[in-house]
C-alpha cells in the first residue's frame, strides 16, 4: 500500500490516503497497454470511406459498340473498371474498425496506466472539488497552485457539471469520472488529478 498526501485546493495537506498496490503499484504491462490504446484509437475511426463500384457508377447501360466487326476489343459497358470514370474494383467500403478486448486485459491495461502515472510522480490526490458555480479562472488557479503541467486529466467520483464547465475552455485539461476512466485519456495526460472519493471508487472496481 502506497501512502499519498491528500491536498486541499489551496495546495495544503488535509490528510493522507493509502492506495492499493494492486491498482496503483503493479509493474506496467506494456504490451497490454499498447493493445488497449490501439483498440480505443480504432474505435474512434469514422470508417465512412467509400468509393463507387461498377454497379454504383451512373451510366453505362448501353453497350458502347457492337460485339464483332469493329476490330476493337469487345466492351459491354463504359463503366467497367478499365474505363476512365468506371467503377473501382475492391475499393474501401464503410465499416467499423472497433474490436473487443477481454475484460481481464482491459482492467490490466487500466491498472498498468494508473501504476505508470504513479511511478512517474504524475498522480495528485485532492480532497474534493467544491465549486458552487462554474469558474474557469478559479479552476485554472487551482491547477496552478497544485503545480500541474499543461496536459491534465481530472477524475471525479461522479459527474460534476461545475467542474466540467470550469475546465472546458482550458486547453489540455480534460475531466472524466471514475467510471469513465480509460487508458487513452490517462496516457495522453502528463498528470492525473483525482479526488479521494474517486480513487476509492477506482480501487473498488479494479482492485
UniProtKB/Swiss-Prot annotation:
MF terms (GO), sorted A to Z: rRNA binding; structural constituent of ribosome
Region (Disordered): 50-76
The keyword Chaperone is annotated on this UniProt entry: no
Record-level GO cellular component terms: ribonucleoprotein complex; ribosome
Swiss-Prot/TrEMBL GO biological process terms: translation
Keyword terms of this UniProt record: Ribonucleoprotein, Ribosomal protein, RNA-binding, rRNA-binding
Quaternary structure and interacting proteins, as annotated: Part of the 50S ribosomal subunit.
PANTHER family cross-referenced by the UniProt entry: 50S RIBOSOMAL PROTEIN L4, LARGE RIBOSOMAL SUBUNIT PROTEIN UL4M
Task performed by this protein: One of the primary rRNA binding proteins, this protein initially binds near the 5'-end of the 23S rRNA. It is important during the early stages of 50S assembly. It makes multiple contacts with different domains of the 23S rRNA in the assembled 50S subunit and ribosome.
Record family assignment: Belongs to the universal ribosomal protein uL4 family.
NCBIfam families: rplD_bact
Protein's name in the database: Large ribosomal subunit protein uL4
Amino acid at each position: 500500500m502506497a501512502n499519498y498526501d491528500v491536498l486541499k485546493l489551496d495546495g495544503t495537506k488535509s490528510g493522507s490516503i493509502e492506495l492499493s498496490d494492486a491498482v496503483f503499484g503493479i509493474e506496467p504491462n506494456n504490451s497490454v497497454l499498447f493493445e488497449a490504446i490501439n483498440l480505443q484509437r480504432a474505435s474512434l475511426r469514422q470508417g465512412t470511406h467509400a468509393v463507387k463500384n461498377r454497379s454504383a457508377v451512373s451510366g453505362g447501360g448501353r453497350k458502347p459498340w457492337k460485339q464483332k466487326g469493329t476490330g476493337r476489343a469487345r466492351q459491354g459497358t463504359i463503366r467497367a473498371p478499365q474505363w476512365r470514370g468506371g467503377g473501382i474494383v475492391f475499393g474501401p467500403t464503410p465499416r467499423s474498425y472497433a474490436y473487443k478486448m477481454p475484460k481481464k486485459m482491459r482492467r490490466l491495461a487500466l491498472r498498468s496506466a494508473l501504476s505508470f502515472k504513479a511511478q512517474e510522480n504524475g498522480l495528485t490526490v485532492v480532497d474534493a472539488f467544491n465549486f458552487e458555480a462554474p469558474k474557469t479562472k478559479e479552476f485554472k488557479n487551482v491547477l496552478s497552485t497544485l503545480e500541474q503541467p499543461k496536459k491534465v486529466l481530472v477524475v471525479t467520483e461522479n459527474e460534476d457539471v461545475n467542474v466540467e464547465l470550469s475546465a472546458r475552455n482550458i486547453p489540455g485539461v480534460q475531466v472524466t469520472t471514475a467510471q469513465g476512466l480509460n487508458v487513452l485519456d490517462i496516457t495522453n495526460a502528463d498528470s492525473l488529478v483525482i479526488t479521494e472519493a474517486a480513487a476509492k471508487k477506482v480501487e473498488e472496481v479494479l482492485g
